[in-house]
Amino acid sequence: MGKDIDAEMMMSFDLSPLDWAALLWFLVAWLGYDALSPRVSVAGRSINDSMKKVRFEWMIEMLQREMRMADASLVGHTISSVTFSASTTMIVIAGLVGVLGDIGQAYNVASGLRFAAPMSQSLFESKVLVITGVFVVAFFRFSWSLRQYNYLCALIGAAPSPREKNLHQRAALELAKLMTLAVTSFNQGLRSYYFALCVLVWLAGPGWFALATFGVVLVLLRHHYGSAAARLITEHATKP
């Protein structure tokens, strides 16, 4: 009885072996990139390590200032960006839930697209569920980033004064580490948007889905290691 129910549930998704393979590759690429990117460097160079040093330098400079309004403004601007991203993601999720609520009409529209491969309504619904899941994960990452930025604000408020120089090194390190955690969560949320685009390409078929996932990984790697911004930040962090 239990095996029959499991088989029926698997059939309801209506995914072919190629679809399952492309979906598995997508999950490995998405979650694997998020897990490995903060830890991996290419040719001894990593924008994450460079930015850790830049944030530490920023916090050292901040602790030496009597007036920290500019620093508070910069953090506030970043918090606004995170809040906007979380709000936008909620709107996207609401729209996708609306699609699931009228899946028949949405299926008819999607089937009429020239690039869309033939698919059943169950398969189309599975694809909508996957992209909805991606945006739900993105929302949780943005909201966690926002909470960590709020913790950072509390630490900035409790930071030692310019006269307490013996406490600056440790305080700057703690502030920089917490900021890095908040930024990492925010970056993971942004990357979820990149990978959500891959699921849209899935409408054209599993082969295009797998190819789009590979393309997004290449784009992210170039941004992370090969872009002009990455080189400039690395040069700044490694200068004497």
Model region roles, listed by residue range:
Residues M10-S12, M90-A117, W202-A210, V216-L221:
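Juxtamembrane "helix exit" motif at the C-terminal ends of alpha-helical transmembrane segments
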Residues D19-I47, T83-V97, V128-N150, Y194:
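Hydrophobic alpha-helical membrane-embedded segments
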Residues S37-T78:
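Membrane-interface amphipathic/juxtamembrane segments adjacent to transmembrane helices
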Residues G76, Y151-A158, K177-T184:
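Short amphipathic alpha-helical coupling elements at transmembrane boundaries
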